[in-house]
Amino acid sequence: MKQLPVLEPGDKPRKATWYTLTVPGDSPCARVGHSCSYLPPVGNAKRGKVFIVGGANPNRSFSDVHTMDLGKHQWDLDTCKGLLPRYEHASFIPSCTPDRIWVFGGANQSGNRNCLQVLNPETRTWTTPEVTSPPPSPRTFHTSSAAIGNQLYVFGGGERGAQPVQDTKLHVFDANTLTWSQPETLGNPPSPRHGHVMVAAGTKLFIHGGLAGDRFYDDLHCIDISDMKWQKLNPTGAAPAGCAAHSAVAMGKHVYIFGGMTPAGALDTMYQYHTEEQHWTLLKFDTLLPPGRLDHSMCIIPWPVTCASEKEDSNSLTLNHEAEKEDSADKVMSHSGDSHEESQTATLLCLVFGGMNTEGEIYDDCIVTVVD
């Protein structure tokens, strides 16, 4: 595996550089299809945690929860009872329960799921809420970025093998009312697909790529929940090729996608999409790129800088200031108050865990790079 520079606790990361995080403790084993979520500090905690939930390897699907404590710089295996084993599921943290992680759908070896479960990290228990309305059909839907406020948005997903569900409705789950709905939409929705990314930025949801049979999609679609109108976008710039099983995060006016697979193999590239200018940029890096991968997961984390060796730049910011922005990515920091040490200067990183290449090698590494 490629040797990336190691980012030590407190170090200030440089732009245009991929790093490895070498975190001691009980780390997750190599896996694919897991979810990766950042939960801000609660109670007396000084720093937030990254939660790796579920996933699979060729032998089994997982029901475990691993946490990376960003204050202690340590992995822990949390003994959380009640999760049904699953991989390629969706995870989200709704505004009404900012201290809990919800998961939807996914699959295990016996088939697809369409149930919801909720993790209470304080009690280390999973519960299955009573949902009063019919859910979407069972499907894989691998995302940690498709929620706005209290609502998770579901479009498409995997049926079996390379075939997607044929459902092109937009399904909306409200965590406050515990109901599913299928609102009327305008315009033409994307064609059926799975392995696409679905990411929320402000009031808009963006869908890129995906797969149906042997066809890889390179199109970009958007729906604004304020008018529920689908649009197929025609962005400028260096657009990504058709791919699937990549991952995405949103930060301010930018959407970042990393990795995925094409007919030629796994990708090691990261693209930035400007949501207002509708422009793609292939990001250039000064150091080695990480191994290409698919079916990984990623999230945005605040990285505390305590021993910066270079002059502060625009990537260093205070979390309290950043929390004033009203977009989906700023949930990373919006729940942390002045009582937490996390209001110190920090740098925002995109954290990627796990995944695999097209030769069958499965990863257990944790890599990061600066986003702005």
Curated annotation (Swiss-Prot):
Rab9 effector required for endosome to trans-Golgi network (TGN) transport. It comes from Homo sapiens (Human). GO terms for cellular component: cytosol; endosome; endosome membrane; intracellular membrane-bounded organelle; trans-Golgi network membrane; transport vesicle. Keywords: Cytoplasm, Endosome, Kelch repeat, Membrane, Phosphoprotein, Repeat. The modification Phosphoserine is found at S133. Residues 314-340 are annotated as: Disordered. Phosphorylated on Ser residues by PIKFYVE. Kelch repeats lie at residues 49-95, 100-146, 151-200, 204-250, 254-303. This is Rab9 effector protein with kelch motifs.
